[in-house]
């Protein structure tokens, strides 16, 4: 992508797309409705707790990046919509897949089909794969296939509006509990060895003083 979005912008954009596809009768969205959509607990990973100020700042940034618009200016209540149709010429299947990736993060083809059904009907897995291939073939690409995770059969796909995600291989794995225990034990043993050396020095000094004291009476 030629723009990079932060976490809040990603959530706002994904929510706008989702509501257009699932509840078109209530779209475009007011600020209050959009904030509620961003914070809803279902179909979100992670669940966020944004306030209206954070959503407004994200909207301003998305408008500057030509990804969102104020709809029906001059109306009693300002309403907002995404601008992906105008900017990127995306069709409903592509929008549904992108919305799911924006709202939940990297997912497999199977997960995208199951979860994306509420926004657009996908007859089978090849239909999802075709959409993903189209999104990856764009210039710049909107989606990428991630390296397969150890122990997982299927690859996951990620949106690129927020830049390339860090793969598991690139992340520093958290220390294993057993390894942490070994490190702590080694540190404790090291401290004990230092104390033993110190005590031996004190004992040797005491012996020397005792010998000096005894020599005074010989």
Swiss-Prot record:
It holds the Pfam family DUF480. It comes from the Bacteria. InterPro entries: DUF480, WH-like_DNA-bd_sf, WH_DNA-bd_sf. Signal peptide: none annotated. Belongs to the UPF0502 family. This is UPF0502 protein Geob_1184. It comes from Geotalea daltonii (strain DSM 22248 / JCM 15807 / FRC-32) (Geobacter daltonii). The lineage of its organism: Bacteria, Pseudomonadati, Thermodesulfobacteriota, Desulfuromonadia, Geobacterales.
């Amino acid at each position: 992508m030629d723009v990079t979005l932060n976490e809040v912008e990603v959530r706002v954009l994904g929510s706008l797309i989702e509501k257009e596809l699932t509840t078109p009768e209530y779209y475009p969205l007011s600020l209050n409705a959009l904030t509620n959509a961003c914070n809803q607990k279902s179909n979100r990973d992670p669940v966020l707790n944004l306030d209206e100020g954070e959503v407004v700042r994200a909207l301003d940034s998305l408008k500057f990046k030509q990804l969102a618009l104020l709809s029906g200016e001059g109306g009693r209540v300002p309403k907002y919509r995404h601008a992906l149709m105008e900017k990127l010429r995306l069709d409903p299947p592509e929008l549904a897949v992108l919305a799911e990736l924006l709202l939940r993060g990297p997912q497999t083809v199977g997960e995208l089909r199951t979860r994306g059904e509420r926004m657009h009907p996908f007859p089978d897995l090849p239909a999802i794969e075709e959409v993903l291939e189209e999104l990856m073939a764009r210039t710049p690409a909107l989606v990428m296939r991630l390296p397969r995770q150890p122990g997982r059969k299927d690859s996951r796909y990620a949106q690129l509006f927020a830049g390339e995600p860090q793969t598991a291989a690139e992340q520093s794995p958290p220390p294993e509990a057993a390894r942490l225990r070994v490190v702590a034990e080694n540190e404790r043993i090291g401290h004990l060895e230092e104390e033993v050396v110190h005590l031996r020095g004190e004992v040797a000094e005491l012996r020397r003083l005792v010998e000096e004291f005894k020599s005074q009476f010989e």
